[in-house]
Structures are given as C-alpha cells and as structure tokens.
Amino acid sequence: MAEESKSKMTYRYLGNSGLKVSVLAIGTMLTNYYKKDVEAWMECANAAYEAGVNYFDTAEIYGMGDGDKMLGESIKKYGWKRDNLVISVKIFSSSPAPTHNFMSRKHIIEGTKESLKNLGLDYCDLVFSHRPDYQTPLEETVRAFSWLIDHGYAKYWCTSTWPPALISDAIGICEELGLHKPIADQCQYNMLSRNDVERDYMNTFESHKYGTTVWSPLAGGLLSGKYNDGNIPEDSRCGKSEAFKGMMWGPMMGDDIIEQRKKMFSGLKEIADELSCTQAELALAWVIVNKDVSTCIFGASKISQVDSNVKALEVAEKWTPEIEERINNLLKNEPEMPVHYRTFAPWPARRPTRVNYDFKAGVLEQ
C-alpha cells in the first residue's frame, strides 16, 4: 500500500535548484494551537511519508521549539531515512530574549543550531528567514545564511513572505559577494489569497526562477467545507483557538462578505460533487495545478485529512479549462495586474498561463 501511494506522488524542482520536493508537504504549525495533539500529528506525518511526501516543514516559533521536537521524534519513531527527507526550518523568533529574535548573524546561526538540536539532526535541507527584518543590514543577513551552508548546517536557504524587491536586493548582494542565493519563498496561496503567487512574485519567478513553498492552501480550513453555512463548528480550528479565529475568520469571513462567501462555497461544493471529490480536495488541487507552486504545505490532525489531501492529486489530473473558468467566476478575486507601459494596458493575468492541464500524478515536473 505504501509503495503504491508513493508512486502517485508528484515531485517538482524547488526553484532554480536540483532539489526535488513532493508537491505536497506537511508542516508543524498546528503545535501553536493544539499542543495536546502531538501523537496525532506524528501519525499524520507518517501517513504523509508513506504517501510519498518528502518535505517536512517546521519553525523555531512553532510551539517555541515543540514543532521541531515533534518532527524530530517522528523521524526517530518511524525510522525514516534521512536522505529521503527534505527538512525545512524557519528562523526569526524563539523567545522574548533580545538576542533570540530577528535576522542578526547571531540569531540566524544560533537559532538554526538550536532547531537542529531540537530535531536531533546534524543539518537541515532548507533554512528560511521566516520574516523580513528591516532593522538588520541585509548584507549581514545574507552572509549569515550563506555561512550556514558553507559550514554544513543547511543545504539551501530561502525566504518567507519577503517582498519581491527585498528578494531581488538579497540576490544582488549574493551575486556581488559570491554568496549562496536564496531559492524560494514561503508565501500564502489559496483561493482566497492570490496576490503573492499570481501577481507580486511575477518578476521574481521570471528573473530568478524562484520557487515557492506555499502555505494555508485551505485558508486555515475555511475552504474545507466545514464553514459553508457561515458558522464556526466547535471542533474546527477557529472553534478551538481564539488566536486562530482572529487570524483567519475576521479577515476572510467578515460580516461584509460572509454572504458572498457562502454563495461561493456553495458553488465550489457543486463542482466538487461533480468531480466526486471533497471541497477540500478541490481547493488543494486548485493550488497544485499552478506550476508556480513548487510544494504546498498542509496541516493535519487526522490521518483521514492526509488521505484526502493526497487524493487532491487525482483531482488535479482531471483539471480542465472549463473547471478553471467556473472556479474563477465563482471566486471573483483575480488579482488586479500592474500596467504594462509599452501597451498602457494591464499585464495579462499570470495564472491562466501557469495552470497545468496535463497534470500526471507520480511524475517529476520540470
């Protein structure tokens, strides 16, 4: 069963590198909200591994180190081969102490070492700047990440929610000084949040072949089908965590747009039913058919959720221009593109040129 599942996983190169990552990844962010569900998460992580997921994402701030430890325990418990894994850690903040925060050389290096200690590993494959830091000189930051690679603590470095101009500045400094360049950004991408991938990073993709490790493909569960009636289920993430509710519900399901959202959810459910899939599987497939997405990070607290996410690969194989158009008409949120000053007309929308209508599960996509 495990080998059959693995054969269905699709892999893509991460940005302008030779690193192959599964198009689906699992992360530890839920430890911020559900610390009691550690065992359940570990079982989910193993189910993901058995399904061919090779990318596992964590951060020093997730549970203030608990996310790292949970992933490390999973590697030991299930005997995963280290050279089969792509482990990513994110550095930005680990405690209130003044030296435990932001993108100084000191914290980047010491924070990475602490994450590796919590993971029980000698190195990570990817180390991320979890957020941009405008107070620390950019050269100091990029030198520190390059140092980690030179000294064997990481194989590549990446950014997370960095603005495109800052990414270009960082790459320019690296090229000038002969340092290792970042290869991907971890940004949000889902049906309700499209601007980063479909507009803002357009030139970054073209100029630098930058990759993405996108997060929140189901918009924190809002696209899962649980919220279709406009109410918050008690057993949902928003129902269990006020912090999570404040982060996701307010901005995306406010009183001024909730009726519009309910109508949209109803339309998505109709399409999902026609494709014999769940609404969550449809939403995830919508993300991964975009070739600008290198890998898509999901969270899970139940094995059934992992199984459903993997089934999104089958939904992606069924993708057609008609499905794409119907969904886009429901969403009504295609990013407003910048003006192309040779024509004084907006740039063409990017997503239509990047959707893969020949998605085949189990292949390596260029």
Segments (PLM) and residue ranges:
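Aromatic-lined glycan-binding groove of carbohydrate-active enzymes
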Residues: D196-F244, T278
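Glycine-rich beta-alpha junction loops
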Residues: I91, P163, Y189-S193, S216-Y227, ...
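Glycine/proline-rich, positively charged
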Residues: K35, E50, S94-D196, D200
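Conserved, mostly hydrophobic/aromatic
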Residues: L14, I26, F56, L71, ...
